[in-house]
């Protein structure tokens, strides 16, 4: 159930009874549980419009809520706030229903969409580095939540598999195989660096590389076969990283830049035909009045270079048109570094004008900040090099495994390694996903691997704590009526019933940290409940009801962490 929506509906009916129908309720959870479960903040705005005394109007609303099946009490506070307490019978009934529902009381959206989400999208011919982490895990989490809430999700890994760098790589590979027929690509990163040195230092080699670019773009079969070697090796490296991270990205989700090659010229010509693109110094350019350059003139969105070459803008236009026209997307999400914001704003504006992005479809730029080191600079190795993502994940598992062994010396090596991988990978992902994606954040091993505070290990341990209760519980009845008598039982119940609203917020806004914050709140509330309300020592209906609350807490933590792409363990 959507608890927020249910309470808001009751409040709206009370507003109507008080003569202010249609005024925004402005419902929020209370910051202090002693004041109740929710607070209505919309009366003062309504009173100003109606030219009434806000406290008197608030009292009318509170009186209209008296005897409500959902609201136990409504008390006016301050200049016109209304604090609401929910009926324990209402909470108990809905906890019982959620516990006995395969989706834990979370309904699917009434308005499902086909959503195309573009994330990860590394440039190929290099190994993935830490700069690819945020897009990969943020996009994965958003796509999971969108699917769980009932949408059709099409994942698109828009890899950079085309461009001038491949001419350089093919030229260097041909050169190496000429000297050594048995030469094979092994270390992709090292090979790329060596090729780049040759390209920068040898003009003749650079000319050869450019010739291979022309052959590649012309469809030369021999050059295409060599190009495919780089693509296949790069994608296998990327898939290994995705598998380690537990992402849902699969090879069939790859839709690289090369996929749209045949559409680039038609798109450029179409923009000219529609009067959007004009010739400017031999290039085809869309001038956008909505954006200004430094001189205050309309910004130039170049769709074809002088000489006929194409750019990212060309590919992105063709790609967007394909996703709307062929994939039938109603919503497009691009999970990309926030520094690309202007490019995507111009892309969406051009696409809207060209008719590629119809009025009933949405395109959203899901920007994110930078992962920083403790020195406040972008995260690097001690030598200043970019950190390979596979190395970062290996270190995470090693650190977590050492920590697990330290806490549980009796664990066998295999069990410690299994727990270490789950904790280590989970810690890296949660440290990112628990932050507002638009912010930069500091990468800190000690903080993310801590079993205290808002971390993955803390939430994973909270889940194992629930499981330990049921290993000792013996018989209990999930179908028996739920009874809530203690304040912390009610608080925990109310929190668990907010799950649907939180997931809908994540689906609507693409901010996974809302879910992380909710799970942390639920886990800390369960910890307080566990200490204050003995579960196994209780008797009768109270014992069974507390077990029901514990079970739904465990279910919610497991499902919620899964939607963040994080695994749980029964024992840690």
UniProtKB/Swiss-Prot annotation:
Query: Which terms in the GO cellular component ontology are assigned?
Result: cytoplasm
Q: Does the UniProt entry include the keyword Hydrolase? A: no
PROSITE patterns in the record: AA_TRNA_LIGASE_I
Top-level taxon in the UniProt lineage: Bacteria
The subcellular localization recorded is: Cytoplasm
| Catalysed transformations (reactions) | tRNA(Arg) + L-arginine + ATP = L-arginyl-tRNA(Arg) + AMP + diphosphate
MF terms in GO: arginine-tRNA ligase activity; ATP binding
EC numbers on record: 6.1.1.19
What InterPro entries has UniProt attached to this entry?
Answer: aa-tRNA-synth_I_CS, Arg-tRNA-ligase, Arg-tRNA-synth_N, Arg-tRNA-synth_N_sf, ArgRS_core, DALR_anticod-bd, Rossmann-like_a/b/a_fold, tRNAsynth_Ia_anticodon-bd
What keywords sit in the KW lines?
A: Aminoacyl-tRNA synthetase, ATP-binding, Cytoplasm, Ligase, Nucleotide-binding, Protein biosynthesis
Instruction: Return the motif ranges for 'HIGH' region.
Output: 122-132
Which biological processes are named by the entry's GO terms?
arginyl-tRNA aminoacylation
The answer to whether the entry has keyword Mitochondrion is no
Q: What top-level class of enzyme does the UniProt entry assign?
A: ligase
Q: Which family does it belong to?
A: Belongs to the class-I aminoacyl-tRNA synthetase family.
NCBIfam families according to UniProt: argS
PANTHER family named in the record: ARGININE--TRNA LIGASE, CYTOPLASMIC, ARGINYL-TRNA SYNTHETASE
Q: Can you state the subunit structure given in the record?
A: Monomer.
Q: What is this protein called?
A: Arginine--tRNA ligase
Record gene name? argS
């Amino acid at each position: 159930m959507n608890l927020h929506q249910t309470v808001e509906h009751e409040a709206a009916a009370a507003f109507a009874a008080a003569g202010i129908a249609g005024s925004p309720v402005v419902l929020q959870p209370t910051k202090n549980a002693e004041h109740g479960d929710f607070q209505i903040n919309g009366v003062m705005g309504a009173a100003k419009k109606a030219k009434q005394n806000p406290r008197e109007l608030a009292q009318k609303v509170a009186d209209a809520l008296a005897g409500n099946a959902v609201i136990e009490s409504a008390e006016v506070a301050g200049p016109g706030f209304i604090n609401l307490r929910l009926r324990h019978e209402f909470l108990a009934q809905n906890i019982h229903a959620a516990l006995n529902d395969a989706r834990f009381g979370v309904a699917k959206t009434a308005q499902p969409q086909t959503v195309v989400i573009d994330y990860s999208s590394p440039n190929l011919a290099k190994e993935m580095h830490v700069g690819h982490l945020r897009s990969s895990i943020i996009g994965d989490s958003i796509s999971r939540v969108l699917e769980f809430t009932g949408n059709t999700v099409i994942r698109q890994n828009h890899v950079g598999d085309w461009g001038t760098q491949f001419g350089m790589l093919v030229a260097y590979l041909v050169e190496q195989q000429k000297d050594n027929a048995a030469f094979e690509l092994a270390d992709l990163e090292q090979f790329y660096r060596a090729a780049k040195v040759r390209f920068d230092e040898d003009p003749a080699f650079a000319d050869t590389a450019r010739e291979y670019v022309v052959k590649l773009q012309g469809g030369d079969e021999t050059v295409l076969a060599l190009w495919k070697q780089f693509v296949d090796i790069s994608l296998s490296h990327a898939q290994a990283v995705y598998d380690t991270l537990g992402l849902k990205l699969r090879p069939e989700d790859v839709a690289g830049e090369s996929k749209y090659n045949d559409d680039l010229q038609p798109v450029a010509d179409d923009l000219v035909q529609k009067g959007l693109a004009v010739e400017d110094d031999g290039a085809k350019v869309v001038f956008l009045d909505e954006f200004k350059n430094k001189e205050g003139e309309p910004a130039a969105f170049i769709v074809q270079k002088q000489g006929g070459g194409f750019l990212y803008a060309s590919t992105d236009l063709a790609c967007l048109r394909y996703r709307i026209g062929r994939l039938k997307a109603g919503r497009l999400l691009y999970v990309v570094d926030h520094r690309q914001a202007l490019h995507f704003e111009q892309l969406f504006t051009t696409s809207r004008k060209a008719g590629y992005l119809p009025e009933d479809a949405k395109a959203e730029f899901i920007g994110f900040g930078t992962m920083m080191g403790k020195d406040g600079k972008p995260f690097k190795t001690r030598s200043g090099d970019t950190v390979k993502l596979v190395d970062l994940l290996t270190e995470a598992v090693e650190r977590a495994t050492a920590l697990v062994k330290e806490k549980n010396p009796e664990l066998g090596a295999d069990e410690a390694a299994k727990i270490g991988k789950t904790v280590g990978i989970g810690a890296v992902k949660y440290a990112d996903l628990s932050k507002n994606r638009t912010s930069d954040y500091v990468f800190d091993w000690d903080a993310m691997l801590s079993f205290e505070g808002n971390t993955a290990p803390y939430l994973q341990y909270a889940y194992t704590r629930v499981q330990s209760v049921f290993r000792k519980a013996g018989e209990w009845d999930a179908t028996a009526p739920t009874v809530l008598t203690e304040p912390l039982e009610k608080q925990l119940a109310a929190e668990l019933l907010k799950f649907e609203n939180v997931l809908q917020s994540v689906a609507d806004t693409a901010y996974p940290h809302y879910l992380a914050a909710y799970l942390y709140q639920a886990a800390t509330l369960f910890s307080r409940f566990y200490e204050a309300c003995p579960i196994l020592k209780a008797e009768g209906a109270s014992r069974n009801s507390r077990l029901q609350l514990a079970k739904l807490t465990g279910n919610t933590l497991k499902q919620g962490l899964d939607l963040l792409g994080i695994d749980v363990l029964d024992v840690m």
